[in-house]
C-alpha cells in the first residue's frame, strides 16, 4: 500500500502504567488493530524526555481509507471488549494526521 497519510496517535499514560498498557496491547489489542487498520509504521514508548508516553503511527492510502478502517475497528466487538483494559490508563490522547514530504524516506519506500 502506498501511504499518503500517517496517523500519529500519542497517549500520556498514568504514572507507572506503561508496562500494563504495553502488555495488554501486545497480548490482545495490536492483533485487533492490525486486522482493521492495516499498516503499522511503528509503536513506541518514551525512554527519555516526556515520561509515560506512547506513540503509534499508522499509514493510510487516503483519508477515506483511514475513516473506513477506523469505523471498522470501532464496530468490532473484540475491540470494544478490549478498550476498557486500556482506557483508564490514558490521561491525555492526541491525534495528528501527517503527510510525508517528497524527500521523506517513508514516501520513497511506500
Language-model regions, residue ranges each:
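Short amphipathic alpha-helices within nucleic acid-binding modules
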Residues: 19-21, 62-74
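A common structural junction motif
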Residues: 32, 77-78
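Short amphipathic alpha-helical segments
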Residues: 17-42
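Short, structured motif recognition centered on aromatic/hydrophobic residues
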Residues: 5-9, 21, 33, 53-58
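Glycine-rich beta-strand-turn "strand-cap" elements at beta-sheet edges
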Residues: 2-3, 14, 36-55, 61, ...
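Short, flexible helix/strand-to-coil boundary loops that buttress conserved ligand/catalytic motifs
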Residues: 25, 70, 83
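Short, conserved loop/turn and helix-capping segments at secondary-structure boundaries
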Residues: 27, 73-76
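Short alpha-helical segments used as structural interaction elements across diverse proteins
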Residues: 6, 30, 63-67, 93-96
Amino acid at each position: 500500500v502506498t501511504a499518503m497519510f500517517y496517523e500519529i496517535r500519542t497517549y500520556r499514560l498514568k504514572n507507572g502504567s506503561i508496562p500494563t498498557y504495553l502488555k495488554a496491547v501486545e497480548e490482545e489489542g495490536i492483533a485487533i488493530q492490525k486486522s482493521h487498520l492495516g499498516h503499522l509504521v511503528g509503536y513506541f514508548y518514551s525512554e527519555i524526555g516526556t515520561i509515560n508516553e506512547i506513540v503509534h503511527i499508522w499509514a493510510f492510502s487516503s483519508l477515506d481509507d483511514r475513516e473506513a478502517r477506523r469505523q471498522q475497528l470501532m464496530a468490532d466487538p473484540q475491540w470494544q471488549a478490549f478498550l476498557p483494559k486500556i482506557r483508564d490508563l490514558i490521561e491525555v490522547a492526541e491525534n495528528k494526521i501527517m503527510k510525508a514530504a517528497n524527500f521523506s524516506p517513508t514516501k520513497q519506500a511506500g
